[in-house]
Amino acid sequence: MQDHNLPFTKAIRSQIKLRLAIIGPSGSGKTYSSLLLASALGKKIALIDSERNSASKYADLFKFSVLELEDFHPDNFIEAIRSAEEQKFDLLIIDSLSPAWNGHNGALELVDKAAARLKTTNSFAAWREVTPLHNRMIDAILRSDLHIIVTMRTKTEYSLEKTDNGK
C-alpha cells in the first residue's frame, strides 16, 4: 500500500465569486435577466456581446460597458476576460458563450479546420488540438476574480404534426 501524504487543512470561509449560466432559446430574456441580476450584484458591469450588438437595446435600462466580439476563437474570450479584470469591473456577462462552440472560429469550426489540415476524416485527431483551447477558455471563466454570468442558446426544435382533420 502506498503512503499518501495529502494533508487536509481546516476549511476557512472566503469570498467566492458567482458563476452562473442562463440558458434558453433566442428571445427568452437571457440578456435582460443577466443585466438585471448583474445590476444587483455589481456597480461596474462589463458585457462581452457575441450576439451582433443585441445588448445595446438595454442601454437605457442598465449601466454597463460592452465589448463586441466577432471572432469566437477561445483565445479571444480569454483576452476579453483578462481585459475586464484589468479594467477593474465587478461583474462580467458573456452574452453569449454559444458562438465559442458553434460560431466563427468556435470549437466546431476549429475542429473542421484541424481535420482538413491533418488531412483526416477522423475528428478525434482534430479534437486533440481543439479541446485544450476550449478547456483554457473554461478555466479562464472559472478562475477569474470577477463575478461571471454567461448566457447560452438552446436549440429550438420544430415539429410538424397532423391533426385529426389531416392538417
Where are these regions (language model features)?
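P-loop NTPase motor core
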Residues: 91-167
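Conserved P-loop
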Residues: 2-6, 10-94, 98-103
